Curated annotation (Swiss-Prot):
The keyword Ribosomal protein applies. Keywords: Ribonucleoprotein, Ribosomal protein, RNA-binding, rRNA-binding. The gene is rpl6. GO terms for biological process: cytoplasmic translation. PANTHER family: 60S RIBOSOMAL PROTEIN L9, 60S/50S RIBOSOMAL PROTEIN L6/L9. PROSITE patterns: RIBOSOMAL_L6_2 (PS00700). One of its GO terms (cellular component) is cytosolic large ribosomal subunit. This is Large ribosomal subunit protein uL6. It holds the Pfam family Ribosomal_L6. It comes from the Archaea. The lineage of its organism: Archaea, Methanobacteriati, Methanobacteriota, Stenosarchaea group, Methanomicrobia. This protein binds to the 23S rRNA, and is important in its secondary structure. It is located near the subunit interface in the base of the L7/L12 stalk, and near the tRNA binding site of the peptidyltransferase center.
Length: 176
């Protein structure tokens, strides 16, 4: 007896998907996003209104990859339909930070009174908006939004002081 490990992902109205040479493309009201999805023994079928991810063999490794590919496809479809957003908060006690966006870089000035600014890289087509003590990161690719937030958080990591006392930084407060 062979276990059925296929996963079906429903495609909402207004979103179109295609698969060409192992590159999965999703297009929706927010934009277009692509991702290469290939693994030995994993098959992806795009049918009307749904995507089916299946494996040739029902082994542990293939079952794990079917679930991974299904999650990637769900994230791509959700991104072009609704988008992703991450909210961060600027926290400081004594030295007020100056945070601004310059192209594909977030510039963090006066962090702990430092003279040189710190630079955090903005990944992909992600948009970063700074208003007061809040930083909002939006985009259609979940991985780019998350990596941009991680880059910003890592650039304000304190290494030479006790982190229990010096809690200055830019921290993730909400992911949606």
């Amino acid at each position: 007896m062979v276990k059925e490990i296929a996963r079906t992902i429903e495609i909402p109205e207004g979103v179109s998907v295609s698969l060409a040479q192992d590159v999965f493309t999703a297009t929706g009201p927010k934009g277009t996003v692509e991702r290469k999805l290939w693994y030995p023994g994993i098959m992806i079928d795009v049918k009307d209104g749904e995507v089916v991810v299946d494996a040739e063999y029902a082994r542990k490794e293939q079952k794990a990859m079917v679930g991974t590919f299904a999650s990637h496809i769900r994230n791509l479809v959700k991104g072009v339909n609704e988008g992703f957003e991450c909210k961060m908060s600027i926290v400081y006690a004594h030295f007020p930070m100056q945070v601004k966006v310059d192209g594909k870089t977030l510039i963090i000035g006066n962090f702990l009174g430092e003279k040189k600014p710190r630079f955090a890289k903005i990944i992909g087509e992600t948009k970063v908006k700074v208003s007061g003590n809040d930083v909002t990161i939006t985009g259609i690719n979940k991985e780019d939004v998350g990596q941009t937030a991680a880059n910003i958080e890592q650039k304000t990591k304190i290494k030479r002081f006790d982190p229990r006392i010096f809690q200055d930084g830019i921290y993730i407060v909400q992911k949606a």
